[in-house]
Amino acid sequence: MAVPKQKRSRSRTHHKRAKIYRAISVPLEKCPNCGEYKMPHRVCLHCGYYKGKQVLEISE
């Protein structure tokens, strides 16, 4: 069975764990219909359009 040769220091452990919880920047693009920012390849939550077609009924 494999055994580590040396103990991993606390700072190395914390540095490795910190990468897991790092905030991920989300790419945003403007909706061609209303101009609001939305996530790519998803329905616009402001107007309900996706690829030029009405998909969701948005009540205002």
Swiss-Prot record:
This is Large ribosomal subunit protein bL32. Disulfide bonds: none annotated. The gene is rpmF. GO terms for cellular component: cytosolic large ribosomal subunit. HAMAP family: Ribosomal_bL32. GO terms for biological process: translation. Belongs to the bacterial ribosomal protein bL32 family. GO terms for molecular function: structural constituent of ribosome. It comes from Thermotoga maritima (strain ATCC 43589 / DSM 3109 / JCM 10099 / NBRC 100826 / MSB8). Keywords: Ribonucleoprotein, Ribosomal protein.
